[in-house]
Amino acid sequence: MKLVCRQNELNTSLSLVSRAVPSRPNHPVLANVLLAADAGTQRLSLTAFDLSLGIQTSFAAQVERSGAITLPAKLLNDIVSRLPNDSDVTLEDNDAAATLSVGSGQYQMRGISADEFPELPLVQSQEALQLSASALIEGLRGTLFATSGDETKQILTGVHLKVQPDGLEFAATDGHRLAVVKTENAAATPATEFAVTVPSRALRDLERMIAIRGSDEAIALYHDQGQTVFQWGDQYLTSRTLDGQYPNYGQLIPREFNRNVAVDRKRLLAALERIAVLADQQNNAIRLSLDPENNRLALAVDAQDVGSGQEAVPAEIIGEPLEIAFNVRYLAEGLKALNTTDIQIQLNSNTSPVVLSPLGPVKITYLVMPIQLRS
């Protein structure tokens, strides 16, 4: 193998695939990145695989000789990231070693034969669902933040993706809040409906890949028992799916409300972030008071031995006055995800689920449970 490529392209590709390199590999070759050069296509592909998540990306290079080798991911990344930006990098392998040259610098690295690197899993289903990149990104940004970080609740650490004839539905919950996004899939209508829960780690990497290597072309989703693959062009991400029954989240969302608040999202978020500085570190609690008589939403925190704070935001309120408390982080993260000018807050009591949604065409539902405070 012998090739010349740009430092910035190699560096970007390494940063993408390195996220699939395990921190404690159970086989030495899994700590490496597979580099494969093709003189026919004049492209260099990089692959990393931890036996659960696999990422493959490629870019244009001047390939003199085809070939493949695996090199230590961390060492290669550390060297390439320190090379001059946009410089020409020459990479040549010789048996189980590789030489990387740039300008007057030359680096030799021991590698492992490409034959020892495991192949990325193939999905047996022949038919792929074509997803529009914009619909995929919209769904991921509106739900990923609500996944659980608790590995004992394994099914809740992923996003539940439901493919329907009229589009895609994304859902995520950690048991305290629920985010649901419905998007139209402009790319194609699925032949069959299906649902799959994909680990949030894989989907965050997918979101990052689309942002860096995305294009206007559709993204193909292949799904088979236990495995999901996203592919566009020569970009490829494969992930094991999460086992178990995802909660029936639809039944958690109330159908009727006796109170409704319409408010400017950015104004409420700004007030929330200011007052959150004083929120009690133990429960992150903030009180919201609905004041329909004065058309305002009052925010208050009272942290023992720290201090207190109050804010008020203009709002259109339908219904009776009410005082309710929330975890300030859950409320702020939901407001950030809604990403529209005006939102509505629908609620019934200070002990029942509260639903936030945008006023407009965007179909996002964010449900959050209030918390109970001692008087």
From Swiss-Prot:
GO biological process: DNA strand elongation involved in DNA replication
InterPro entries: DNA_clamp_sf (IPR046938), DNA_polIII_beta (IPR001001), DNA_polIII_beta_C (IPR022635), DNA_polIII_beta_cen (IPR022637), DNA_polIII_beta_N (IPR022634)
Pfam families: DNA_pol3_beta (PF00712), DNA_pol3_beta_2 (PF02767), DNA_pol3_beta_3 (PF02768)
Range of residues in the leader sequence: none
Keywords annotated in UniProt: Cytoplasm, DNA replication, DNA-binding, DNA-directed DNA polymerase, Nucleotidyltransferase, Transferase
Location(s) in or outside the cell: Cytoplasm
A cellular-component GO term for this protein: DNA polymerase III complex
GO-annotated molecular function: 3'-5' exonuclease activity; DNA binding; DNA-directed DNA polymerase activity
SMART domains: POL3Bc
Family per similarity comment: Belongs to the beta sliding clamp family.
Subunit structure: Forms a ring-shaped head-to-tail homodimer around DNA which binds and tethers DNA polymerases and other proteins to the DNA. The DNA replisome complex has a single clamp-loading complex (3 tau and 1 each of delta, delta', psi and chi subunits) which binds 3 Pol III cores (1 core on the leading strand and 2 on the lagging strand) each with a beta sliding clamp dimer. Additional proteins in the replisome are other copies of gamma, psi and chi, Ssb, DNA helicase and RNA primase.
Main function: Confers DNA tethering and processivity to DNA polymerases and other proteins. Acts as a clamp, forming a ring around DNA (a reaction catalyzed by the clamp-loading complex) which diffuses in an ATP-independent manner freely and bidirectionally along dsDNA. Initially characterized for its ability to contact the catalytic subunit of DNA polymerase III (Pol III), a complex, multichain enzyme responsible for most of the replicative synthesis in bacteria; Pol III exhibits 3'-5' exonuclease proofreading activity.
Stated name of the protein: Beta sliding clamp
Natural source organism: Synechococcus elongatus (strain ATCC 33912 / PCC 7942 / FACHB-805) (Anacystis nidulans R2)
Gene name tied to this protein: dnaN
